Swiss-Prot record:
InterPro entries: Class_I_gatase-like (IPR029062), GATASE (IPR017926), GMP_synth_C (IPR001674), GMP_synth_GATase (IPR004739), GMP_synthase (IPR022955), GMPS_ATP_PPase_dom (IPR025777), NAD/GMP_synthase (IPR022310), Rossmann-like_a/b/a_fold (IPR014729). Pfam families: GATase (PF00117), GMP_synt_C (PF00958), NAD_synthase (PF02540). Its EC number is 6.3.5.2. Residues 203-395 form the GMPS ATP-PPase domain. GO terms for molecular function: ATP binding; GMP synthase activity. This is GMP synthase [glutamine-hydrolyzing]. The active site is at C81, H176, E178. It comes from Cupriavidus metallidurans (strain ATCC 43123 / DSM 2839 / NBRC 102507 / CH34). Catalyzes the synthesis of GMP from XMP. The keyword Signal does not apply. One of its GO terms (cellular component) is cytosol. ATP binds at S230, G231, G232, V233, D234, S235, S236. Residues 4-202 form the Glutamine amidotransferase type-1 domain.
Length: 539
C-alpha cells in the first residue's frame, strides 16, 4: 500500500501542478474537491494534506473551507495561497482584503529556520537574509497569525507571506511553489512530502505495472475487452497494459480514416499485431470519411463529421465482437479531474475519449480505464516500462481528427497526401538535427539542452496545408503550386506556448527537401505566432 498525499482543490487553475510535483517526488497523491466529507478524509488516510489556491476571497466566501477532519488527523498540512488563508481563518488567525495586491514575480524573505525552508534559498542579502524568487497571485492577506504559528516569510507588501506551526507540521505560503516561476518550489514541495510528511518515495511506474495488471485481471475476469486504438500515446499504452494483463481477451480496433501521419497505420500494426502479438482489427475507412468531408470547410463541422463517422465505424465493428463486455479507454488523470470525475460524491461525469464518447452506453459495455490515475508523463514512463519504443511513447500530440484539422478548408485526398509527406520531412529533420553549442550561444536553446534533438526540444511540431497556390520557378519552368506552413512550439502545459526559435539552417533544409521531394508544393513558410493570441493548431 502506497503512502498518500491528499490535495484539496479550492478552485485553483494550477492544482494539477501541485499533484504533478508530488508525483515527481515518487509519492502517490490524489486531487479532491475541498468540500469532501470528514468521513472521506479519514478513510483516505493521508500522510499529509495540501490545500490549493483559489480565485475566491477567504473573508467573503465562508463555504470554501477545509473539512474539520483535516485538522483532527494529526498529519502535516501545507496551505498554498488561499490554502494558507483558510488555514489561518480556521485555526483562529485573521485575513483581510489588501489594497496592495501581488500578482506575478516577487522576492520573499525567509524568517528564522523552519523545517520547510531550511537551506532553501535563491540568494542571500548583504545582511545574510535568505531570499526566494517566487510567483504571487493574491488579493487578500493574513494579518494575524493563529495561536502556535510563527512568521516564516514576508515581502514588503505582504508582511506574512509564510507561516509555520512546527509542532503540528502546519505550514502556509502565500506564493505558489507548484509553478515553474517559483524557482525553488519543487524543492519545497519535495521537502514537505518526503521529510515533513515522512512518506515513502515508492510511486514508480515500473513497479506500478504489477499492481495495474492485477487490478485489470480482477475487474475483467474472463470477459473480453475492446479498445479503439488510435496510435496516440494514451490508447497505445492502455492497449499494451491491458494486453499484458489479459492477452487475447483484448481486441483492438484500429480505424484508418485517411487522415493519419505517414506510415502510421503500418507502425501501429507492426507494433501491436507484430511485436506484441495482440489481436488488432485494421479497418480502412478512408473512402467513407473523405467522402463525408467533401465540400465541408468549417473546422468545427469537420471535427463533428470525423467524430460521428468514427463512432459509426467503431460501433459496427464492436457489434461483431458479441463476447465483449468492456470498452477500454485511454482516459488519464487530467481528464478525470477536469470533468469532476474524482473518486468522491462529485464523481458524476467521465470525460470520454473524443473518439468513443457515448459508446459505453450505446453498446451496453462496462468502462475500463487503466490509466485514469496517471498524468501524461507517467503514462509515457509506463509505456517505456511496458516495452513500447520511445519514438512511439514520446511522440508529439496529434489531434483526434488528424490531418483533417491541419488542412485548411475542404479536405481532399490529394491535399492529405501532400501534407503527410511534408510533415514527415519536417519531423525527420527535427529528429536528426542536434542542438549545438552555437545554438546555445545564439540563444536558441539552453546550455543544458546541447546534444538533444530539436524534436525533443519542441513540445509540438507539424506542417499545415494551405489551399492557396503561389508562383514559383523549378529549373527552366514556371510552377503554380500549393503552400505549406511549418509550426513548432515550446510549452510546459499547452495552455500558453512560444513559437520555437529553430536554427535557420534547419528550417532551410526542411524547405529545400519539401519543395524538391514533394511534387505539388513550391513554397514553405514558418509560423511565428505564440499562444495567445494564436492557438497551437490552426483549426
Amino acid at each position: 500500500m502506497h503512502d498518500k498525499i491528499l490535495i484539496l482543490d479550492f478552485g485553483s487553475q494550477v492544482t494539477q501542478l501541485i499533484a504533478r510535483r508530488v508525483r515527481e517526488a515518487h509519492v502517490y497523491c490524489e486531487i479532491h474537491p475541498n468540500d469532501v466529507t470528514d468521513e472521506f478524509v479519514r478513510e483516505f488516510a493521508p500522510k499529509g494534506v495540501i490545500l490549493s489556491g483559489s480565485h475566491a476571497s477567504t473573508y467573503e466566501d465562508h463555504q470554501l473551507r477545509a473539512p474539520q477532519a483535516v485538522w483532527d488527523l494529526g498529519v502535516p498540512v501545507l496551505g498554498i495561497c488561499y490554502g494558507m488563508q483558510t488555514m489561518a481563518v480556521q485555526l483562529g488567525g485573521k485575513v483581510e482584503w489588501s489594497d496592495s495586491r501581488e500578482f506575478g514575480y516577487a522576492e520573499v524573505r525567509a524568517h528564522g529556520h523552519t523545517n520547510l525552508l531550511k537551506g532553501i534559498e535563491d540568494f542571500a542579502t548583504d545582511e545574510g537574509h535568505g531570499m526566494l524568487k517566487v510567483w504571487m497571485s493574491h488579493g487578500d492577506k493574513v494579518t494575524a497569525l493563529p495561536a502556535g504559528f510563527k512568521l516564516m516569510a514576508s515581502t514588503p507588501s505582504c508582511p506574512i507571506a509564510g507561516m509555520a506551526d512546527e509542532a503540528r507540521g502546519y505550514y502556509g505560503v502565500q506564493f505558489h511553489p507548484e509553478v515553474t516561476h517559483t524557482s525553488k518550489g519543487r524543492e519545497m514541495i519535495e521537502r514537505f512530502v518526503l521529510e515533513i510528511c515522512a512518506t515513502k518515495a515508492d510511486w514508480v511506474m515500473r513497479d506500478h505495472i504489477a499492481e495495474a495488471v492485477e487490478k485489470i485481471r480482477e475487474q475483467v475476469g474472463d470477459e473480453e475487452v475492446i479498445l479503439g486504438l488510435s496510435g496516440g500515446v494514451d490508447s497505445s499504452v492502455a492497449a499494451a497494459l491491458i494486453h499484458r494483463a489479459i492477452g487475447d481477451q483484448l481486441t483492438c480496433v484500429f480505424v484508418d480514416h485517411g487522415l493519419l501521419r505517414l506510415d502510421e497505420g503500418k507502425m501501429v500494426m507492426d507494433m501491436f499485431a507484430g511485436r506484441l502479438h495482440a489481436k488488432v482489427v485494421h479497418i480502412d475507412a478512408s473512402e467513407q470519411f473523405l467522402g463525408h468531408l467533401t465540400g465541408v470547410t468549417d473546422p468545427e463541422q469537420k471535427r463533428k463529421i470525423i467524430g460521428r463517422e468514427f463512432v459509426e465505424v467503431f460501433q459496427a465493428e464492436a457489434k461483431k465482437l458479441s463476447n465483449a463486455k468492456w470498452l477500454a479507454q485511454g482516459t488519464i488523470y487530467p481528464d478525470v479531474v477536469e470533468s469532476g470525475g474524482t473518486k468522491t460524491k462529485k464523481a458524476t461525469t467521465i470525460k470520454s475519449h473524443h473518439n468513443v464518447g457515448g459508446l459505453p452506453e450505446t453498446l451496453g459495455l462496462k468502462l475500463l480505464e487503466p490509466l485514469r490515475d496517471l498524468f501524461k508523463d507517467e503514462v509515457r514512463e509506463l509505456g517505456v516500462a511496458l516495452g513500447l519504443p520511445p519514438e512511439m511513447v514520446y511522440r508529439h500530440p496529434f489531434p483526434g481528427p488528424g490531418l483533417g484539422v491541419r488542412i485548411l478548408g475542404e479536405v481532399k485526398r490529394d491535399y492529405a497526401d501532400l501534407l503527410r509527406r511534408a510533415d514527415a520531412i519536417f519531423i525527420e529533420e527535427l529528429r536528426k538535427t542536434i542542438a549545438t553549442e552555437q545554438d546555445a550561444a545564439a540563444g536558441l536553446c539552453e546550455a543544458n539542452q546541447v546534444g538533444k534533438s530539436w524534436y525533443d526540444l519542441t513540445s509540438q511540431a507539424f506542417a499545415v496545408f494551405l489551399p492557396v497556390k503561389s508562383v514559383g520557378v523549378m529549373g527552366d519552368g514556371r510552377t503554380y503550386d500549393y503552400v505549406v506552413a511549418l509550426r513548432a512550439v515550446q510549452t510546459t502545459d499547452f495552455m500558453t506556448a512560444h513559437w520555437a526559435h529553430l536554427p535557420y539552417s534547419l528550417l532551410g533544409r526542411c524547405s529545400n527537401r519539401i519543395i524538391n521531394e514533394v511534387r505539388g508544393l513550391n513554397r514553405v513558410v514558418y509560423d511565428v505566432s505564440g499562444k495567445p493570441p494564436a492557438t497551437i493548431e490552426w483549426e
